Amino acid sequence: MSPARATAQRSLFPSMEITELEFVQIVVIVVVMMVMVVMITCLLSHYKLSARSFISRHSQARRRDDGLSSEGCLWPSESTVSGGMPEPQVYAPPRPTDRLAVPPFIQRSRFQPTYPYLQHEIALPPTISLSDGEEPPPYQGPCTLQLRDPEQQLELNRESVRAPPNRTIFDSDLIDSTMLGGPCPPSSNSGISATCYSSGGRMEGPPPTYSEVIGHYPGSSFQHQQSNGPSSLLEGTRLHHSHIAPLENKEKEKQKGHPL
């Protein structure tokens, strides 16, 4: 091997190493650039999609508000219908500045504190304790609600709450009132029929039957009165004689004791 060839080979090896190193560096730079481009495109697409969704949501809300505000203007008026040709509705597309505008409720809610950080108290209605109806009429207790004046409440209690009657009205009182033809005074016989008493005050005869009481009761029907007509007449005459007989006896005794 000649010394010239040896020197040539020695000079080739460093040059090949240099070219290989340069090629590797170029490949690494290209790969890094591609990765960066992919990452940038992904980030841009993500932000673009989020911005587009936000803009579409805002435009839908704005369109809904505009539709609600101009709902009466979508239909032609009576004058245009009577004229024959309705006026065309002009649609103006939203401007790009309106699309990017932030709605006011978001601006308000951004600076408002949340519930745990509220400084003012919540205005709740006052607690009212109502009565359950078990207390006496003045309602002495925790009840703090007064719907009426005290005088008016006392008057209502006085008018609505009354004592029971002093006597009990029996069927015999009704029979006496119907036979005598008028109202009778309060009965002192404690519910015993007038036919059961004689002039001496002792009981004579049985009490009136159910048919007699129903026949002489003022609320009975006309047919029942017709069917029990003779019996009612007999009862009337018997009651009349039982009331008149003591009076006649007293008059006779007076005549005997005081002759003319």
Curated annotation (Swiss-Prot):
Topology, Cytoplasmic side: 44-260
Basic and acidic residues composition-biased segments: 248-260
Ranges spanned by the short sequence motif PPxY motif 1, renumbered to the chain: 136-139
GO biological process: negative regulation of SMAD protein signal transduction; negative regulation of transforming growth factor beta receptor signaling pathway
UniProt keywords, alphabetically: Endosome, Golgi apparatus, Membrane, Repeat, Signal transduction inhibitor, Transmembrane, Transmembrane helix, Ubl conjugation pathway
Function: Functions as a negative regulator of TGF-beta signaling and thereby probably plays a role in cell proliferation, differentiation, apoptosis, motility, extracellular matrix production and immunosuppression. In the canonical TGF-beta pathway, ZFYVE9/SARA recruits the intracellular signal transducer and transcriptional modulators SMAD2 and SMAD3 to the TGF-beta receptor. Phosphorylated by the receptor, SMAD2 and SMAD3 then form a heteromeric complex with SMAD4 that translocates to the nucleus to regulate transcription.
Family to which the UniProt record says this protein belongs: Belongs to the PMEPA1 family.
Protein name: Protein TMEPAI
Organism: Mus musculus (Mouse)
Lineage: Eukaryota, Metazoa, Chordata, Craniata, Vertebrata
Record gene name: Pmepa1
